[in-house]
From Swiss-Prot:
Start and end residues of each LysM domain: 31-75, 96-140
Entry keyword annotation includes Signal: yes
Comment on protein domains: The LysM (lysin motif) domains are small globular domains involved in binding chitin in eukaryotes. Vd2LysM contains 2 LysM domains.
Listed name of the protein: Secreted LysM effector Vd2LysM
Length: 145
């Protein structure tokens, strides 16, 4: 196999950016999401830190189909002052990496990734959850997409 083809092929097996879906916040812990082509029920639920049962109950639907593109559905809409964190997903697991930036706090990162600061601290060997260093990468749950 040619080296350039091998490099291209292996690039598809490595980490990939996982961009989360966003919602229009209503101020009540809820919001609206507009269904896009290629969406599936499990991925939408994972992006909004909920279950397919909640989406079914709130929207009276049991799945997402292609004829629902551009349909607005109600979702839990977690509010984090406008910051939406994404992860670099490991294609071989449900985890990924998040790059810590100045001003980040572990509790806020945990909130965005549908987990707790204690869980993130354990996953990353962080002894003091109140202190995390900017410009470092940590492992985070990254199940969407």
């Amino acid at each position: 196999m040619r080296p350039d083809v091998f490099v291209l092929f292996t690039a598809f097996l490595g980490p990939a950016a996982a961009y989360r879906r966003t919602c229009s916040h209503t101020g009540k812990g809820e919001g609206w999401y507009i269904i896009r082509r290629g969406d599936n029920f499990n991925a939408v639920a994972a992006d909004f830190c909920t279950s397919t049962n909640v989406l079914t109950e709130w929207n009276h639907i049991s799945t997402i189909t292609d004829n629902m593109v551009n349909t607005k559905i109600k979702v839990p809409c977690r509010w984090n002052a406008g910051k939406q964190r994404d992860c670099l997903k490991d294609q071989k697991s449900s985890n990924g990496w998040y790059h810590i930036v100045s001003g980040d706090e572990l509790k806020d990162i945990a909130y965005d990734f549908c987990t707790t600061s204690g869980s993130l601290a354990g996953m990353n060997g962080i002894s003091n959850p109140d202190y995390i260093k900017a410009n470092t990468d940590i492992v985070v749950p990254c199940s969407w997409n």
